[in-house]
Amino acid sequence: FCWHYNLFGLSVLVMLTLLGLLIAGYLKLNVGRTPVSAAEKWSVDIPFSVYLGWISVATVANVTDYLYFINWAGFGLAPQAWAVVMLVVACLLGLLMTVTRRDSGYVFVLVWSFAGIAQKQSAAALVANSAWVATLFMLGLAIYSMVERNRAGNGREVK
């Protein structure tokens, strides 16, 4: 709502609030660490992880729009350099979710998002190439996450 009416500052506050609430719920549910049934995994954990991933990406997009709206100078760094910095930060989040939670749902959202960035920014070689590298890195992490979870006997799942 806020974003559609160019209320970018308010939109950022709404998104940060939603992101904070989702993180609190994610931690409370202990996604990736507590054994759950297959039904709960597919109806709660995976959708929650995917939604948290999308809201994480959307929050970055909203902050980016807000900074553009207020003509932020970026501490002298070019917008393309900031895009690469944000890709690195997002990759670190994906790595954190893989190492601490083996959460492939969250990481697959990053794969999709980075591929979209690479495609949309194809004219900006630095951004596009960095996004493709990030896409491949996240895809590798997602696959690693699934393999490790299965190697552990899918230890989260309760029969």
Where are these regions (language model features)?
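Internal transmembrane alpha-helix with an interfacial aromatic "cap," most often the third helix
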Residues: 1-38
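Membrane-interface helix caps and helix-loop-helix hairpins in membrane proteins
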Residues: 1-13, 70-77, 99-100, 121-126
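Alpha-helical transmembrane segments of multi-pass integral membrane proteins
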Residues: 14-27, 44-62
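Alpha-helical transmembrane segments and their membrane-interface exit regions
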Residues: 17-27, 114-117, 136-144
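Membrane-interface capping segments at transmembrane-helix boundaries
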Residues: 27-33, 143-158
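A loop-to-helix transmembrane entry motif
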Residues: 44-53, 72-86
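Membrane-interface transmembrane-helix boundary segments in multi-pass integral membrane proteins
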Residues: 76-92, 118-140
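Central hydrophobic cores of alpha-helical transmembrane segments
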Residues: 105-117
